[in-house]
Curated annotation (Swiss-Prot):
Residues the record lists as N-acetylserine modifications: 2
Domain of life: Eukaryota
Subcellular location: Endomembrane system
Name recorded for this polypeptide: Protein phosphatase 1 regulatory subunit 14C
One protein family per Pfam: PP1_inhibitor
Amino acid sequence: MSVVTGGGEAAGGTSGGGARVFFQSPRGGTGGSRESSSHSGSSREDSAPVATVAAAGQVQQQQRRHQQGKVTVKYDRKELRKRLVLEEWIVEQLGQLYGCEEEEMPDVEIDIDDLLDADSEEERASKLQEALVDCYKPTEEFIRELLSRIRGMRKLSPPQKKSV
């Protein structure tokens, strides 16, 4: 069973485990990092290149996460939330119609954007009836409610890339 929205999904940022960050106080300041004071015979200046490289790596990682997060920012969050609620409702209703859990459900594809592209309510209803042809329970109420819920929704188009 799948519910297709037509939009891309934001990739979750994963942190590279084991990366260490060293903090360095300004030269002439008091107190070094715990890391530099734990090495015998090393000074703050000795650990400065390590701190700079580690900090640069962290900044790069944050920039990567920020770039990945831009995908959801370009979509209207309110529309995404409405779409997610609708998809969860569809999965719940299909579970009731087919009388089984999501994992056991036959492969039913309801493409919300495809429904929104349809020219009329009749065409949308027809597409839904085709998708639910294997359902043994009455689907009219589900179709009516789904059409009511998508009324006024906008199609999620892929985000436009900004030209640099």
